[in-house]
Amino acid sequence: MMLSRAKPAVGGESPHTDKRKKKGRKIPKLEDLLSQRDFTGAITLLEFKRHVGEQEEDTNLWIGYCAFHLGDYKRALEEYENAAKEENCNPEVWVNLACTYFFLGMYKQAEAAGFKAPKSRLQNRLLFHLAHKFNDEKKLMNFHQNLQDIKEDQLSLASIHYMRSHYQEAIDIYKRILLDNREYLALNVYVALCYYKLDYYDVSQEVLAVYLQQIPDSTIALNLKACNHFRLYNGKAAEAELKSLMDNASSPFEFAKELIRHNLVVFRGGEGALQVLPPLVDVIPEARLNLVIYYLRQDDVQEAYNLIKDLEPTTPQEYILKGVVNAALGQEMGSRDHMKIAQQFFQLVGGSASECDTIPGRQCMASCFFLLKQFDDVLIYLNSFKSYFYNDDIFNFNYAQAKAATGNTSEGEEVFLLIQSEKLKNDYIYLSWLARCYIMNKKPRLAWELYLKMETSGESFSLLQLIANDCYKMGQFYYSAKAFDVLERLDPNPEYWEGKRGACVGIFQMILAGREPKETLREVLHLLRSTGNTQVEYIIRIMKKWAKENRVPI
């Protein structure tokens, strides 16, 4: 935003200046202060000159320029708006005013001021970014075509690539500029940020180290380093990296304090989320997403949905989170519509060119096929990144279900038993699938023990039904009979008696065939006697007769 200057900001020296020089005193020149990026000093000089009546041409613009570069956008806005009201104002004020509106998030005002400005490279870059903000693809492409192969335009293009999640394209531009401009150290931070977004956290650290060697107290760089540590190690390691920033209470960037508070919530696993995140929802883009994640972890699916339902997703992370929330709500409400929306979001991300070969992209395709119950396809994707999630309970939970659903109950059982989370191990989906694996793997006693550990509830009743029916199908009649017996006691449904009768007769047949111990007959008779059905006596009479003939004690 440096204003073009045809002459020095300070005019010819007055006699008073000569006198001061003779006394050995020297007032700094505006040009020198600007070249040293001493914007505070420059503002002080300009305000002093304004106060003593030595105001130079375009003083408002220069104070606005300095305030802008100090991050004091409100002060810059005040100066530029005053300058714009002047008769025959410098036309360059409009593009600078537009940039200030942009940084204040006042995009409509920025566009209006931008169109009043004379055509320039800066105006085109500004309108290019505004088109992105307004999701106006047609205007975006028009302004894109006006970009030239100069550093400022290419950096602007790289920024748009980054915001559109085209991280590799942004990296290519930054690296090309760095080849000829090694002194542009900050570009290393941008490259590191792109690698972070691509999940290459170790590469991001290496690139970031180049910048931190020169500027070790950079707020943005230290924060990114902490985020890399969070991904590579854990929250404690990340928090340790932020300590120097937290100790630096004199940081001039107010936004940094908010950023640190936000990231500490993430690093601490959601601790303090309800106190810190809500006020930041419209300040830090990730705050809304992390608050949604917090609600999901607290099983408050409805609150998560309320927070994200009106968000128009533009990044893969937003699409993924909307998919997860809709899937959770669909399961909770039994809503096919929400499940379909979730499946479409997952497919959109997983099928995109930028995400199809990333782990999140493959996770999305696995989730899409999971919702479609196409478990062979689920396994293709899960197997492609299995090595990264060996000890991850959520991954193992889904992987085991997919294995069991495709008939590989042996491996499904093994993976289910790797899960450590007590919350997952008490989930009915876990219990029912593990019970099914046990039954299919000829371990019905273990399935029965899962039921015995449960408290009486609707879920324990459902597990009984599963054990009764699956054991019957597998010819494991003893545990089928026990399950049907309990079901019959809880609910005198004729179907349960029929199941119990069939299972008891099945056990008797297995005893006759020598595939079940004869002593089991005593318990079968006990199960039958607990039923008041008229058919019981006939069945018992036949069994007793056989027992007597074969000298089996009953």
Swiss-Prot record:
Basic residues bias locations: 18-27
GO MF entries: intraciliary transport particle B binding
Keyword Plastid: no
UniProt main location, coarse: other
TPR repeats: 57-90, 92-125, 151-184, 468-501
Listed GO CC annotations: centrosome; ciliary basal body; ciliary base; cilium; intraciliary transport particle B; neuron projection
Keywords: Cell projection, Cilium, Protein transport, Repeat, TPR repeat, Transport
Entry keyword DNA-binding: no
Biological processes per GO annotation: axoneme assembly; cilium assembly; intraciliary anterograde transport; intraciliary transport; intraciliary transport involved in cilium assembly; manchette assembly; protein localization to cilium; protein transport
InterPro entries: TPR-like_helical_dom_sf, TTC26
Pfam families linked to this entry: ANAPC3
Family, similarity comment: Belongs to the IFT56 family.
Assembly and oligomerization: Component of the IFT complex B. Interacts with IFT46; the interaction is direct.
Chain's role: Component of the intraflagellar transport (IFT) complex B required for transport of proteins in the motile cilium. Required for transport of specific ciliary cargo proteins related to motility, while it is neither required for IFT complex B assembly or motion nor for cilium assembly. Required for efficient coupling between the accumulation of GLI2 and GLI3 at the ciliary tips and their dissociation from the negative regulator SUFU. Plays a key role in maintaining the integrity of the IFT complex B and the proper ciliary localization of the IFT complex B components.
Protein's recorded name: Intraflagellar transport protein 56
Native source organism of the sequence: Rattus norvegicus
